[in-house]
Amino acid sequence: MRALIQRVSHASVTVDGVVVGQTGPGLLVLVCAMAGDGEAQADQLAAKIARLRIFKDEAGKMNRSVLDIGGAALVVSQFTLAADTRSGNRPGFSSAAPPAEGERIYEYFAAQLAAQGVPVETGRFGADMKVELLNDGPVTIWMDI
């Protein structure tokens, strides 16, 4: 699985003019299931993100997790994270999981992150979404599992 994790002051996702998910201080997690991914990868990614220490402690060091700060996560599917740009000028996405499997793994991942104790809201898989965020730091982490 592939994820782009952003520490945010707030974030929201809108579909057809309606906010379908939002968070205050916490994480925006853009996530892509890759071909061959399954529940094991989703479990590992959820556990890692829940404990990822990218929030400042009292000394100003990145030493606290989203769980430690009582934050939440907005999880948004984004198959374009699978882009292959090595050849030509048009990205290829053949390394992404097929849509039905990608949706299943995406939903499973969001549920597993919530099971770790992180309040989770989500976007809508496959929809044309508008994502707004205020990146805090900025802190942006690329993660492959």
From Swiss-Prot:
One of its GO terms (cellular component) is cytoplasm. Its main location: cytoplasm. CDD domains: Dtyr_deacylase (cd00563). GO terms for biological process: D-amino acid catabolic process. Keywords: Cytoplasm, Hydrolase, RNA-binding, tRNA-binding. Signal peptide: none annotated. A motif (Gly-cisPro motif, important for rejection of L-amino acids) lies at residues 137-138. Gene3D superfamilies: D-tyrosyl-tRNA(Tyr) deacylase. Its EC number is 3.1.1.96. Belongs to the DTD family. An aminoacyl-tRNA editing enzyme that deacylates mischarged D-aminoacyl-tRNAs. Also deacylates mischarged glycyl-tRNA(Ala), protecting cells against glycine mischarging by AlaRS. Acts via tRNA-based rather than protein-based catalysis; rejects L-amino acids rather than detecting D-amino acids in the active site. By recycling D-aminoacyl-tRNA to D-amino acids and free tRNA molecules, this enzyme counteracts the toxicity associated with the formation of D-aminoacyl-tRNA entities in vivo and helps enforce protein L-homochirality. A Gly-cisPro motif from one monomer fits into the active site of the other monomer to allow specific chiral rejection of L-amino acids. This is D-aminoacyl-tRNA deacylase. It comes from Ruegeria pomeroyi (strain ATCC 700808 / DSM 15171 / DSS-3) (Silicibacter pomeroyi). The gene is dtd.
